[in-house]
Amino acid sequence: FDKCNDPDYIISSISDFILLLNKNSRAACMPIAGSLADATSSQTMSWITGFPSRVKFNGKSFFHDRSICDSQEIIRNRNTDLAIHISTVNHNKVELNDKIKNIFIGHINSTFNIKPDIFIPVGNPGIDHRGIMFRTDNVVSVLLDKIREIELLSTQDVMNMLSEVDNL
């Protein structure tokens, strides 16, 4: 793409080809994304099985444990002692569990049923910072641009800082 004079034409051609294939079969265009292609893996699993990545394959069938990632059940069964909540867009009241420690990274105007142990306010993607928004099935993405200047860090900045602390 870097050396192409018209990268939009390439994307348009790929999209047209996928539409043509979908007349008689099933096809999708999925990006190779994430540091270890984790976004690609999730999209492919959703496309092929209808389930997210947490699938166990057994011969010609598969098993999906829908409770393995159920945060409410994990907290209720005391399988964790810490929850990290990330919510940069929605500032509605967040229900935190008082039986565990809670770290909240998110919208500066967020409200809570109880005070989080740590609250890190961050900017909104597409308003305060550039970013990418994925449709809930992870198949479609939209590039978000920054439209205002604000002193808040992005969620990515916070995560990068936390990963650097871990490497000390």
Annotate each predicted stretch with a short phrase.
Residues 1-27, 34, 48-168:
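Non-catalytic alpha/beta scaffold blocks inside enzyme catalytic domains
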Residues 42-43, 53:
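Low-complexity, serine/threonine/proline-enriched polar segments
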Residues 38-39:
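Small-residue-rich helix-loop
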